[in-house]
Amino acid sequence: MNLHEYQAKSLFAEYGLPVSEGFACDTAQEAVEAAGHIGGDMWVVKCQVHAGGRGKAGGVKVTGDKNEIRAFAEHWLGKNLVTYQTDEKGQPVAKILVESCTDIANELYLGAVVDRASRRVVFMASTEGGVEIETVAEETPELIHKAIIDPLAGPQPYQARDLGFKLGLNPTQLKQFTKVFMGLAKMFEDHDFALLEINPLVITDEGNIHCLDGKIGIDGNALYRQPKIREMHDPSQDDAREAHAAKFELNYVALDGNVGCMVNGAGLAMGTMDIVNLHGGKPANFLDVGGGATKERVAEAFKIILSDDNVKAVLVNIFGGIVRCDMIAEGIIGAVKEVGVTVPVVVRLEGTNADLGREVLANSDLDIIAATSLTDAAEQVVKAAEGK
């Protein structure tokens, strides 16, 4: 689950971190009034969506004219913002963040992730602020400095100072940076973050550290113990198919191919997508139906997959462990009949009663292709998607 920038900055403020005064507004009039409440003669107005690249897409504006604030809000509220991180439809803009304008002398980067390789929370800092960290990692990895947090000892001030020295901060800025670092580390643990980014973390003209942006991703598995964070969820930013799948405990991620994939087990699902690619196809989705491939769940999975108009064929790859393959085959047949599937369906079954399962499919009188192996399944579904 992701948070909006205004929500992230609200959490920053709770932990005593330096952020700009700002208000999230639902209407153009509120945006104008917010600028008046903030005061000053320059403001920043930003569309609030769960995507980066807003500035290049026209979703951020610096202005000293309240009429321009009104025009900006009227233009974007209720519309979709398309950036390089969204699909072609973009993300809906329901709020505009109005903030005081901050003078920038230098831009830095500070972020943290749960690193699977080290099995630790890892903080990253760089002098290349305002640039996508992935770009920095690819082009100039030596400019990314890391601090690995020991889960027993916790974050230490010396780690912040070490990063600060590498960023070229002066003694006053080091103290401020240490406060930001320690606050973010505590926030990361308190709220079960999976990702945290401040890009850019700026040094103002007065020489002070300031959090100019905020990006937060929450570990979805921990939301049950984060009631406050759950209330911040904005369902309008979710993919409609992914949200529907979650209601049925299906793990679905939309992709841009034409081969629908339905698999039980995340590892097998990724392997299935790989072999479809290997044989010249493009997966339209990742979909893990989990351990219980029942008729009801398979039917919902078909509905979700086929709601994508790009899908020209579906590959069902099921390993029957606890659930017998003949029962799975009957569930697939029932689901195909219930949903009224019109595209070719290729099914590969392995595991308990696999031969019986394939026999059940063959005797179904439905347009279901029973594959003999995963390679055969991939070849068959790619041909079917191409209309061959």
Swiss-Prot record:
* A biological process from GO: succinyl-CoA metabolic process
Single GO molecular-function term? magnesium ion binding
Q: Which cofactor does it need?
A: Mg(2+)
InterPro entries in the cross-refs: ATP-grasp (IPR011761), ATP-grasp_succ-CoA_synth-type (IPR013650), ATP_grasp_subdomain_1 (IPR013815), Succ-CoA_synthase_bsu_CS (IPR017866), SUCC_ACL_C (IPR005811), Succ_CoA_ligase-like_bsu (IPR005809), Succinyl-CoA_synth-like (IPR016102)
Positions of substrate binding: N264, G321, I322, V323
- In the Enzyme Commission scheme, what number(s) does this protein have? 6.2.1.5
- List of residues binding ATP: K46, G53, R54, G55, E99, T102, E107
- Pfam families found in the cross-reference section: ATP-grasp_2 (PF08442), Ligase_CoA (PF00549)
| PROSITE patterns for the chain | ATP_GRASP, SUCCINYL_COA_LIG_3
Keywords, A to Z, come to: ATP-binding, Ligase, Magnesium, Metal-binding, Nucleotide-binding, Tricarboxylic acid cycle
Database matches in HAMAP family: Succ_CoA_beta
Protein known as: Succinate--CoA ligase [ADP-forming] subunit beta
